[in-house]
Design a protein with these regions (language model features):
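Generic beta-strand/beta-sheet core signal
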Residues: 252, 278, 391, 440-442, ...
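Glycine-rich, charged/polar anion/phosphate-binding loops
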Residues: 375, 423-424, 476-479, 492-497, ...
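Active-site bordering "gate/hinge" segments
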Residues: 1-486, 655-673
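Active-site lining segments that contact anionic ligands and/or coordinate catalytic metals
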Residues: 487-489, 504-506, 513-516, 545-549, ...
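Dual-mode signal for accessory low-complexity, basic/Gly-rich regions
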Residues: 518-590, 594
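Short, glycine-/Ser/Thr-/acidic-enriched flexible segments
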Residues: 256, 344-346, 395, 444, ...
């Protein structure tokens, strides 16, 4: 489509929308909804004009803070209780027939802020035209049926599936997308007005991070960036993958870290890698604060309104076509380098019956789509040629002692990896003598789990456990394996854990032959709500998941620091998994790359790269992979013992009463004092 035609479509749409707030052709209660949405879209048009006039460059920081808040004000704090974006209010105000559909429309129009700031006129215009189409329906003498409204939204999603898929592919592999990169590389980072150029919601977390990093010397910033970029390079080195044939890396970070990211961009360019930086499909790759996490949670299943088999097929066809179109860029893509953040108050969502929920058939469709999509991506971005690194830093919200905690995390991220590599080898040597590992909790922790290990045909050349220090997952350290499922049986329990930004109280999983057979938590009063919470956010609508990983974290320094500052509950799994034994539900760490040999520093091959489920990949990949991998850690304070069980019935104690007891590992207890 030509720019001229697109501009004409936009002009016609916004001209019509400007007229709607004064009209009375739509009956109540829908009139108020459409009028409010029209006012919002007019506000987006005004913001677009002011950006084009250079307002983001000339306004004061105080003025920009007000400007930044305007697109989000309807969902912030108590305002959300009477917002049409709240499904509970929308259904109450607009009725059962249309409340959920119009609430879904509200969320879709809420994406306009991104399209406006990035000047993505096609998406903005298409959403406006959808709004006008629905408005015209409600102007008719007879109100539209619920099905008619749903079909209109369905065709909007279907008609633009190819355009959206193209942009999603480009967000991963195309370095010519420069919106975020320009902000990072061209802004005066000492002038915090730059934070408002993204259009993301900016809070004291983002401002405080940028302000604090501005107190660092350039040498300190370069060192932080070097830890991160070297982790990425080492990931390829350790896995014996050739980084030299790659051309791009995807940088993902939270707004406020631009000084570090600018240094990292320059360092990646020295490696021959041009960064690709974008928000991502769900605005999680480069993001500011969430204006309201409950709002995000309420809309997590909005596609339940229109998801069907035809749409899944259309999306998969579009994905295949677009990856093929960008196959050269995809082949040069090395992987993501991620800067995570932590420290926000753990979010405990409210389950709302008025929110959209996938039915059983749609759950199967989503799982099927994820499986097929994973196979398409792996054809163009081969896992055995791919790497990644992840590092994490705290946000100011974590504690009044934020600056001290931040510097402690910097130290933890740069611990002596050679020391941990040496100590962890003692653990691996002991573990390789075993047929299984028994893990027992203590106190309120009810964990009692036996983890089965693969048989080593040649212990002199083979090992079950990878000696993991600070490459892919920063900081050090852990040893991990893909357990054998048969015989892996028992209960995994944690009194409280924060997984993927959601809190679980008294999470309990029962495993039989390595598969989850029962699950519960204590987040909600009703057992059904607790099970649904786990099914949606941990099982991801799979009926069951295998245990994909068993590991022993060795970073006692991080654990003691977390206890000292009382922040253990706010740490991301990236750090928490190094602070005790942990178990991952879902795919193994070697998903899609099981046939690529992996070696430890001592030269032994890590042979535990698959389990009984992932072994099905050669016959039917859809039965081998789940598209998820969620780590659950038992902290040392809740740990009675970890012991290797040998085939002859004898045991080798590794941890007792939360302390390492295996000869050669005692040094790990020093941080405890």
């Amino acid at each position: 489509m030509t720019d001229e035609l697109l501009n004409e479509r936009y002009a016609l749409a916004i001209e019509r929308i400007r007229q709607i707030p004064a009209e009375k052709s739509v009956p109540q209660p829908y009139r108020d909804f459409f009028a409010q949405m029209a006012q919002y879209l007019c506000k987006m048009d005004q913001i677009r004009s002011r950006i084009a006039e250079g307002y983001l460059k000339t306004a004061s920081e105080e003025e920009l803070a007000v400007f930044n808040r305007e697109p989000y004000e309807d969902v912030i704090g108590e305002r959300y209780e009477t917002s049409y974006g709240n499904p509970a209010f929308a259904v109450r105000a607009l009725g059962e027939t249309h409340g959920r559909s119009l609430c879904c429309l509200y969320r879709e129009l809420g994406n306009a802020v991104v399209w406006v700031y990035e000047d993505r006129l096609l998406e903005l215009t298409a959403a406006m035209e959808l709004y006008l189409e629905l408005y015209a329906m409600f102007e008719e003498e007879t109100l539209p049926s619920a099905q008619y409204v749903k079909e209109s939204i369905y065709w909007y999603v279907s008609d633009y599936a190819e355009e959206r898929q193209e942009y999603q592919v480009r967000e991963i592999v195309d370095p010519s997308l420069h919106f975020v990169k320009d902000i990072v590389m061209e802004s005066d980072l000492t002038d915090l007005r730059y934070l408002y150029q993204y259009g993301e919601y900016i809070t004291e977390n983002e401002k405080g991070t940028a302000r604090f990093l501005n107190t660092f010397s350039q040498e300190e910033i370069d060192a932080m960036a070097r830890t991160y970029t070297e982790g990425f390079r080492k990931c390829f080195l350790v896995a014996r993958k050739d980084l030299s044939k790659k051309k791009t890396v995807s940088i993902r970070f939270h707004i406020g870290f631009e000084r570090m990211i600018r240094a990292a961009i320059l360092q990646f360019r020295e490696m021959g890698l041009e960064p690709v930086i974008s928000r991502g499909a769900r605005r999680t790759w480069v993001a500011g604060a969430s204006a309201n996490k409950q709002y995000d949670y309420d809309h997590r299943n909005d596609e339940a309104l229109y998801l069907n088999e035809d749409l899944v097929k259309r999306r998969l066809r579009a994905m295949q076509v677009k990856y093929d179109e960008y196959k050269e860029l995809a082949g040069g893509y090395a992987g993501p380098a991620v800067v995570e953040t932590f420290g926000e108050v753990p979010f405990e969502p409210v389950n709302k019956k008025q929110a959209l929920h996938l039915n059983e058939r749609q759950q199967k469709l989503r799982v099927g789509f994820q499986n097929e999509a994973g196979q398409i991506v792996n054809r163009y971005i081969k896992d055995d040629e791919y790497g990644y690194t992840i590092i994490a830093y705290p946000m100011p919200e974590i504690d009044p002692r934020y600056e001290k905690i931040f510097r402690e995390i910097v130290k933890i991220n740069t611990l002596d990896y050679e020391k941990y590599q040496r100590i962890q080898q003692y653990l691996i040597d002991a573990l390789d003598e075993g047929a299984s590992v028994q893990v027992l909790g203590k106190g309120e922790n009810r964990t009692d789990l036996r983890v089965m290990l693969h048989h080593l045909n040649d212990p002199a050349k083979e090992t079950n456990f990878e000696n993991c220090v600070a490459d892919c997952n920063i900081p050090v350290g852990e040893v991990f394996t893909s357990p054998s499922l048969t015989g892996t049986t028992g209960v995994l329990h944690v009194t409280g854990v924060y997984l993927n930004e959601l809190y679980y109280r008294d999470l309990c999983l029962t495993l039989t032959d390595g598969m989850i057979t029962a699950y519960d938590c204590a987040n909600f009063e009703k057992e059904e709500d607790n099970r649904t919470y786990i099914e949606e956010n941990l099982l991801y609508h799979h009926r069951t998941l295998p245990i994909g990983e068993f590991a022993i974290g060795t970073n006692t320094t991080a654990y003691v620091m977390a206890e000292q500052y009382s922040i253990a509950g706010k740490l991301p799994i990236l750090i928490a998994e190094k602070m005790g034994p942990h178990f991952a539900m879902g795919d193994t760490c070697y998903a899609w790359a099981e046939d690529s040999p992996m070696y430890n520093p001592d030269g032994k091959e890590v042979i535990a790269r698959e389990n009984e489920v992932s072994a099905k990949r050669k016959e039917d990949p859809s039965k081998a992979y789940f598209g998820c991998h969620t780590d659950i850690t038992i902290p040392y304070r809740e740990l009675q013992s970890v012991a290797v069980e040998k085939a002859d019935g004898t045991t080798i104690p590794l941890i007792e009463e939360g302390r390492f007891v295996l000869p050669g590992t005692e040094e790990l207890n020093e941080p405890f004092g």
